[in-house]
Each structure stands twice: as C-alpha cells, then as structure tokens.
Amino acid sequence: MTKNLLVELGLEEMPAYVVKPSIKQLRQKMGQFLETNRLSFEKIEMFSTPRRLAIRVVHLADQQSDYSEDFKGPAKKIALDADGHFTKAAQGFVRGKGLTTDAIEFREVKGEEYVYVTKNEAGKPAKEVLGGLIDVLQSLTFPVNMHWANHTFEYIRPVHTLVVLLDDEALDLNFLDIKSGRISRGHRFLGQETQIASAASYETDLRAEFVIADAKEREDMIIEQIREIEKTYNVSVEIDEALLSEVLNLVEYPTAFMGSFDEKYLELPEEVLVTSMKTHQRYFVVRDQTGKLLPNFISVRNGNEQFIENVVKGNEKVLLARLEDGEFFWREDQRLQIADLVEKLKLVTFHEKIGSLYEHMMRTKQIAAYLAEQADLTDQEKAEIERAASIYKFDLLTGMVGEFDELQGIMGEKYATLAGESQAVATAVREHYLPISSDGQLPDSKVGAILAVADKLDTLLSFFSVGLIPSGSNDPYALRRATQGIVRILDKFGWEIPLDRLVANLYQFDFDSLTYQNQADVLAFIRGRVEKMIDKSVPKDIREAVLDSSTHIVRLEVEAAAALAEKADEDHFKASIESLSRVFNLAEKSNHNEMVDTSIFENEYEQELFDAVEELHFTEDMTDNVDRLFVLSPIIDAFFDNTMVMVDDEAVKKNRLNLLDRLAQKANTIAAFNEIRTK
C-alpha cells in the first residue's frame, strides 16, 4: 500500500529571494531522506509562499523495503586461530556489524578464503521512520538566519506551525518546541487558522483561507490578470521574469491592479522611471502598443479586490515620492560640473587599503592607454579613451546615483552627453560597468570595452596586491565576475593580447598610489576564469593542455579547446597525440630556441621532419591548424622509428633535440600536447 505524505512548515514572512531555493532544497533533502531510509515514492510536489514551505510525497510506501547486504571481513587465516576458534579480529568484525560469529561463512576470492556475513533487516513501517523528518528540517541552510525566544538554534524565520499528515492521519513530531498536527494558517489578513483534512486536500483547504499554495498557480494568476488589464486598457506590459519571480514570492493571494502617475514625470530619463517602478516598488512597467512608456504601472496586491481603490491610491502615493526625488536630482545634477565631481573623487575611498576612487581612475587611465596600443586602436579612439578614463566615475557623486545606485554609468552617460562630451566618451562611461553579471551584456564599443577591461584589471590587481583574494565561495568584491568580464570582452573583440604578457607588463607600471603585488596569484586566478570560458563538454585534460599552451590569448585558447574536443573521437586522434607527446617530452631536454644545423643530418627522416616543420604555418582557423599539425604524425613516427635522438655524439643529439623543440614550440601555440591523455 501507499499513502500521501504532507509536510508544511509555517513561518513568519521570508524574504522573496529565499523562498524558491529553500523549497527546492527541502524537496531534494526529503528525497534523499526517503531514499536513504528505503521508502519508495512516486514523486515529491512542492508548495511555497512567503509564510510556508511544504512538500507532498505522492504514493509513499507504507513500509520500508527489506534490506540485505554482504560484508567481506578478514582472511580465513586471520579469522581462525590454530585451534580453529574465531580470533578477536573475526569477533570484532561481526560485532561491528551487529551480528555474532554464528553468521560467519567463508567464501573464496581469488584463491583465498575470506570471512563473509550477510546482514538482513526487515523493513519498518513508514510511521516509525518518519520521525527523522525533523532532521531534514533542521538541515536546511539559508543565506541569512535569526534566532528567537530562548532557542539557540538559528533559522530563516521563527517557526509557528508544523503540519505532518500521512493521508488524513496527523503524525506527532516536535520541531523547535512546535508540535506537529494538522493546524495551518490562512492569509494574514483574509484568512484564519484552518485544519488540513488530508494530504490530498492541502491546496483546497488553504484556498478557502485565501492562500494559493502552489507557486506556479500564483504565477499563472498574475500573468492572466496582467493580460486581462492589457486587453481592457489596450496597453502592453513588460513581464520581467526576475520581477515576476520576486512578486509571486511576496504574496499568498495575488490580485493585480493598474495605477497611474502624472504625465510630467515622463520627461525624466526612462531609466529613472523604470528603476523607480521595477526595482524600488516592484511594479510592472506599462507601455503603449508602439513601446512608448505610459504614465501607468501594474502592481500585485497580497489579497483580494476588496477596497482595491485604497490600495491603488496608496501605491500611487508611494511612487509619487520616488518620482519627485528623481525629478529633483535630475534637475539639480545638471548644474554640477564634471571637473568638480572628478576632483571630489579624491575624497572618496575606493577601499581603505587601496586608496581613493580618483587614484583607481588614474591607474585605470594608464592601463587603458596601454591596452589601446595593444588593440591597435585609431588615434581618435585613443583620444576618446584618454578622456573617458579621466572622468568615468564622476556620476557616483551625483544625487541621482546616490539615490538610485543601480543607475551608475547610465546616468553618467546622460550627464556626459548633456555636458558636451562626445558620444563615444559618454557611451564608454556607461559601458565600463559591463558586464554586470557573469553572463551579462558586454560593451559594444571599442572605447567602452577597453575602459571596462582596464577598470576591471586595476580592480583585480589592486585587491590582490593588498591580500584581498577570493577563497572558496567567498568573493565579497566580485573579483570573479570582474575577471570573467575581462576574458569575455577580450574574446568578443578578438584582441590577441596574451594575458601572461599583459599582466607582466602591468606589474612594471610605476604608480604613486599603489604597487602591484602577488602576480602569480593573479595569473592563476585569470586562468581559472579563462577555463570557465571553455565549453563544459571539453574534457579536463584538453582544457588544461590548452591553458598551458604558449598563446595565452583568450579567443585562441577557447577555439583550440573546441577544435581538439571535436577531433577527440576521430580515429587518428590517439596516434597524433602520442606522436606529439613524444616530441614535447624530448623537446624539454633541449636548450630551446637554438638553430637546427641541417648539414649534420644523418638520414632522410631528419630532413623530412625539418622540411615539414619549416612548412608548417597556422591560419586563423583553429580546426584547420589542428589538422595541419596532426597530418605530421606519420612523418614524426617515421623520424622516431629510424632515428635515435639521445645518441652519444653531443652535437647530433643537440641538433635533433633542437629540431623537436622547433616543432614543439609551434605546436604549443595550440596546446601542451603531452598533457592530453589517450588512454
């Protein structure tokens, strides 16, 4: 027989961002618990609101499956003494399994007999096992915790109710002094405490108390209500996925409504309006059918339509205060001078161990100038980079960015344009923040891209220099994201700037404000971010071989990894890698970069390999380059089959090593082939 199990944890309001990962974690840990305890089930359904986390296990077995496992013990010669009695080793082994020596039998394994015991355990009724659910609830982890009353135990929020039902039977458990039962809570304002009749009636019982327990159902309700508003008013609403996810985890009974604001505020930059509505008030933005912003918004109430007009007015009033602030800052900021704001950056701390924002900006300016040379930009682009790098942080001291920090860079572009800066400079001021997430949008302009890379490089090197290096998952200064941005931008624009040489050259810069330190750590950190750029399907040994190549150019490393992974299933791959590995291993014994003397070749195979190496030239197509290299495999094999490299004649040996080194150096621009496994 099977039954349905319901577990609901009733809490005080959780932050919206915690709800979804927490219910997923509960489902996963519940599944592990049931599997570990040999309780089969069909599926686990999830329910969540800001005030509850619940799962329903469908068709849970009413009894554990029986358990039987064989255990191998010591060899027979160790298990028995000279008189044939069981030794302490044998007795200790069976005692550790909860058995006696009566359970011992001997089995032959590879010609020798060993002690074996079989442990059988009859399955227990599910009700006896489910007391362990408390351990599951206690094991949940959260990004923030609190403790309350006399409890030393911390949890995301205080727990008020615990429902545990096996079909319609309430189980007696205790969690943080809360006894389980069938009492749950309805909507905070519209509902009341209610009894859950059975696991199967959970959603229905809560719906009667104005709680929609299924997050997907709440999401569908919100979307349907917004679409209905669109039809009624002939408008278009942007349903942002992140905002929708947040809103549905702020409410238990959603009711969408439309509010409005004075049209005069449409004169503000659109980003100010959208940020005020979406980010600060969690409103959905409303546009007309052409995409033009309208003086309206859609919000979602946690409740029904009763007194909805009062809710609309309240939301309009709150938004009005935001828009009035935005209007004030927009007007006042335009009176400021960029030069004055830049000067004031000298008084703004970038980090207490690193210095001011102005000093950071000046270091970035030098790095940007160097990068512009390496990227072969035009004189005009270099001039634009110099200007942008001289001012690009100025908007941090504007009132608008002080109030709406999400608009940093965005407002900088607008204020720079109003101040008469060129479009390229203004755009770079905005784009230098990109990407704002590990896979976010990248700069589109070369000037913005160079400034973004320079800014992130100084940030990375500065924090590493003062010992603020990420460890484990701890990365408070988002240095992984910044470094990922560096390699992604270099890859996008195809700038063939070797990262090892780039970093080495930056460490030669002479700044008054800071001396870069910990170069090896920086290079290792960047290497890790480049590896993230390589497709996850590429085998680890190929990734490592490419990263250990001599190129250190992001685009080429990514393309080389893809090309080698593509070839890995081809018939000639193994032979080609083995040939090149032999070349690499012997080339390590050479003095490197020395000339090859063809006059002392002793056989035709040396000459054939030399000619092939001299004719080996790579193109922009990495797959083609790998093919050009692999086609040399028969020539390499013929050389090794007919030529002893490590001969007694020192000149001949050195010459042959130099020949192999010449090939290895060319091949190493693709990968360190002796690191690729062929078994």
Curated annotation (Swiss-Prot):
UniProt keyword annotations, A-Z: Aminoacyl-tRNA synthetase, ATP-binding, Cytoplasm, Ligase, Nucleotide-binding, Protein biosynthesis
Localisation per UniProt entry: Cytoplasm
Main subcellular location: cytoplasm
Enzyme class: ligase
GO BP term, example: glycyl-tRNA aminoacylation
The keyword Transmembrane helix belongs to this UniProt entry's keyword annotation: no
InterPro entries assigned to the protein according to its UniProt record, in alphabetical order: DALR_anticod-bd (IPR008909), Gly-tRNA-synth_bsu (IPR015944), Gly-tRNA-synth_heterodimer (IPR006194)
One annotated GO molecular function: ATP binding
SUPFAM superfamilies named in the record: HD-domain/PDEase-like
Catalytic activity, reaction form: tRNA(Gly) + glycine + ATP = glycyl-tRNA(Gly) + AMP + diphosphate
Assigned GO CC terms: cytosol
E.C. number(s) listed in UniProt: 6.1.1.14
Highest rank taxon of the organism: Bacteria
Family: Belongs to the class-II aminoacyl-tRNA synthetase family.
NCBIfam families given in the database record: glyS (TIGR00211)
Subunit structure: Tetramer of two alpha and two beta subunits.
Name listed for the protein in its UniProt record: Glycine--tRNA ligase beta subunit
Organism this protein belongs to: Streptococcus mutans serotype c (strain ATCC 700610 / UA159)
